[in-house]
Every structure is written in C-alpha cells, then in structure tokens.
C-alpha cells in the first residue's frame, strides 16, 4: 500500500511527528481498535531521524494514508498520536507505549516493513495491540504485553459434538419413535373400528343425515376390511397348499430317482445273466459235438410245442418228405406190424402222457425224436415208425 501525505511542505512528502495521518483509502483506519492489517499487529517506532518510516513509495499492502492537518501534542506525551478533533468512532487517539524489546517489525533501507520470525513472543497472534477495553476516550493506550488467549468458546471440530453417541441416540430415538407411531396407529385404528361398529349398530331412524352418511362410510370400511381379511386368509391357505404340494413333489422326485437307479441295477444284472446263459449254451453245444453219440445236444427246454414243430424237427437232416394228407395215417405193413406216421406219433405221445397221468413236459421229446431218427419205414405214405419202437422210446425217456 502506498502512503500519501497532504499539506506537506517537504519535497518528498515525508511524514513527521507534527503531522497526523489518516487512512483515506479504506473504511477502516490503519490503526483501529484491534490494530489489524491482514491479521497482523504493527508496532511503530520514532527514531527521530528526518527519514520517515512511511514514504510515498513505501508499500504497505496497497492502502493509501494521508495526513490532512497538523495534530497537537497532548499532555506533552511522547510517541505517535492521532488527531482528537476528528469526530469519528473508528479513529483512535492517544499515546502509544513502545515495547523495550526487539520488535518483530523492523525497517530496512528501502523503507519497507519486514517481519522477523525469530521469536514467538512477538508473533502477530501473540501480541495484542488493541487498546484497553476498560479505559475511556482519554485512556486508549496500546499494550503489547497482553497475549490473546483462546476462550472456551473457540471453535473445535469436535467441541460440543459427540458423533458416535448422537448417532446411537438418533437410531434409538428413531426406533422408539417408529414403535410409538405404530402403537398409536394401532390404537387409533382400534378406536375407529369401535366407533364404526357402534355407529353401524344404531338404527337409521335415530340418525341424522350426516350420521347416516357416516354410517354408510363405516359400512363400506367394514365391508372392505372383511374382504381384505378373507383375501388374506385365502392367500395364506393357498400358500400352505403350495408348500405342501412342493414337499410332496420333492418326495415323488426322490422316489422316482430311486426307482430309476433300481431299474438300472436290474437291467445290468439281466445283461450279466443273459451273457452267462449264452456262454453255458455254447459250452453244451461244444460238449455235445465231442460226445460218443455224435449228435447235436439241444437244451431240454427247447422241445416242440406243436405237431408241425415235431414233424419238422424229426425230418431235419433227412431226405424224407411227408404230405399233409398222410401225416396222421396209421396202417399195417406186410407182416402185420402197425406203423405210425409222424403226425400219428405226435398224437400217440399225447395220449400216453394223459394215460400215465403225467405232465406233458415230463416226456423228453428230444430223446424220443433222436431214437426215432433213422428207423423210418416207407410204404408210399411217407416216413412211418413201428408202434413197438415208439413205445420203447417213450419208456426210455421216462426212465
């Protein structure tokens, strides 16, 4: 800031003790009640030198200072004084005591103020340059020994605030308020239901038009409430049925899975048994080929079921042919021996089984057929077998 002097007779406009200065560039004077320039306290000294601390070129934060007129020395007190004739509350007048110790603000050859950080005692915050608050207009002296102390009301981020406690208290208060609101709502609803019931129970002839309208509204509310209750009851019933059906469905799925596993096990066992059975049949065939009879052994359960199967099985591997009209023929040869065609042999076997009260499957037809092969008699009616040979084959198969 630049300091300018008015009514100056010196060439450079230097400021002296006989001249006062004011701050014309700001609404606040340079030295007001708190003597704050950018939150810093300024200590001035008069060295008695013709050079002024503040010159026209002196820079003090861009604030212009002017001394409009001379000031008088009050009570012959030393130090810088301010004009008492200026009738303004913001101007300070009186003497200023200078500190005896080294000032934090010193002047250099360029007439600029500099601040020394050598001591914390004279820091701008440590020194209180404000006038005595208890003194009147005639005792506004500056004191530098008083230091500003932090009051109990100074700002602190956590002063007066207990965030965790308040948060817990707020949550508890919210829960309490919600529960109280819920209980109050239930009590109001119950009271309203009782009023509606009492109003509905009254006779229409006893009610006024307004009360009749209120009764209709109460009836509507009661009907809606009953509908909601039925709906909720039905919904709960359906939910219970759905839950039961889901449980039953899960049980059925588990049983089905077990049955599938059992089927797989049974199918595997059947395949193993089938494979073993085919192996046994092949072994029987091989043993039959090596037998002394030199004939193919057939499983005893593979016997013919019909007359046709019996005839085909007997004629298999021979050159004989049997006509259908001669298959059941029974006749005598030249020596008087009775001969039976293949069809007649089948019927005779059935008769013998019935006479002996035997099961049809008890006769080994394979053995009978093997004994009959090669003993055919031909007389123009196809292959035929003597009755004596057939009886011998039946007796041998039964034994």
From Swiss-Prot:
Family, per entry: Belongs to the bZIP family.
- Name the CDD domains on file: bZIP_YAP (cd14688)
Question: Could you tell me which species this protein originates from?
Answer: Candida albicans
Concerning SUPFAM superfamilies, the annotation shows: Leucine zipper domain (SSF57959)
Question: Is Nucleus one of the keywords?
Answer: yes
- Please give one Gene Ontology molecular function term for this protein: DNA-binding transcription activator activity, RNA polymerase II-specific
Q: What is this protein called?
A: Fluconazole resistance protein 3
Q: One GO cellular component term, please give it.
A: nucleus
Which residue stretches belong to region Disordered?
1-21, 103-197
Q: Where in the cell is it found?
A: Nucleus
Q: Where is this region: Leucine-zipper?
A: 235-242
Give the range the annotation lists for the signal sequence: none
- The residue ranges flagged as biased composition, category Polar residues, are 103-145
Q: Which residues are in the bZIP domain? A: 210-273
Q: Which InterPro entries match?
A: AP-1-like (IPR050936), bZIP (IPR004827), bZIP_sf (IPR046347)
Described purpose of this protein according to its UniProt entry? Transcription factor that confers fluconazole resistance in S.cerevisiae by activation of the PDR5 gene. Can also activate the transcription of S.cerevisiae genes involved in 4-nitroquinoline-N-oxide resistance.
* Disulfide cysteine pairs (residue numbers): none
Q: Which GO terms describe its biological process?
A: positive regulation of DNA-templated transcription
Question: Residue ranges of region Basic motif?
Answer: 215-234
Q: Where is the composition biased (Low complexity)?
A: 167-184
């Amino acid at each position: 800031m630049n300091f300018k002097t008015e009514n100056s007779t010196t060439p450079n406009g230097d400021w002296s003790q006989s001249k006062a200065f004011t701050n014309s560039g700001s609404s606040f004077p340079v030295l007001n009640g708190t003597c704050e320039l950018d939150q810093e306290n300024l200590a001035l000294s008069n060295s008695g030198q013709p050079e002024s601390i503040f010159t026209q070129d002196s820079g003090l934060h861009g604030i212009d200072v002017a001394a409009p007129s001379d000031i008088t020395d009050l009570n012959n007190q030393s130090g810088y004084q301010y004009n008492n004739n200026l009738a303004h509350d913001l101007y300070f007048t009186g003497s200023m005591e200078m500190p005896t110790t080294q000032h934090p603000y010193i002047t250099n050859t360029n007439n600029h103020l500099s601040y020394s950080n050598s001591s914390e005692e004279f820091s701008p915050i440590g020194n209180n340059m404000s006038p005595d608050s208890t003194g009147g207009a005639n005792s506004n002296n500056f004191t530098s020994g008083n230091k500003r102390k932090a009051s109990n009301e100074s700002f602190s981020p956590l002063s007066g605030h207990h965030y965790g406690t308040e948060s817990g208290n707020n949550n508890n208060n919210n829960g309490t308020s919600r529960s109280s609101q819920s209980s109050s709502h239930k009590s109001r609803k119950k009271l309203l239901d009782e009023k509606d019931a009492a109003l509905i129970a009254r006779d229409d002839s006893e009610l006024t038009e307004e009360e009749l309208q209120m009764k209709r509204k109460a009836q509507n509310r009661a009907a809606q409430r009953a509908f909601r209750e039925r709906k909720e009851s039905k919904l709960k019933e359906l939910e219970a049925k759905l839950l039961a059906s889901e449980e039953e469905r899960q049980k059925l799925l588990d049983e089905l899975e077990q049955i599938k596993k059992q089927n797989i096990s049974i199918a595997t066992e059947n395949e193993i048994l089938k494979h073993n059975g085919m192996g046994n049949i092949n072994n029987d065939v091989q043993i039959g080929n090596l037998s002394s009879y030199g004939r193919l052994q057939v499983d005893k359960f593979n016997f013919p079921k019909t007359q046709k199967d019996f005839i085909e099985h007997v004629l298999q591997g021979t050159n004989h042919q049997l006509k259908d009209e001669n298959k059941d023929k029974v006749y005598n040869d030249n020596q008087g021996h009775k001969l039976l065609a293949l069809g007649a042999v089948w019927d005779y076997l059935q008769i013998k089984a019935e006479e002996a009260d035997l099961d049809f499957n008890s006769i080994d037809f394979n053995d009978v057929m093997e004994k009959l092969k090669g003993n055919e008699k031909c007389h123009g009616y196809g292959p035929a077998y003597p009755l004596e040979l057939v009886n011998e084959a039946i007796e041998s198969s039964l034994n």
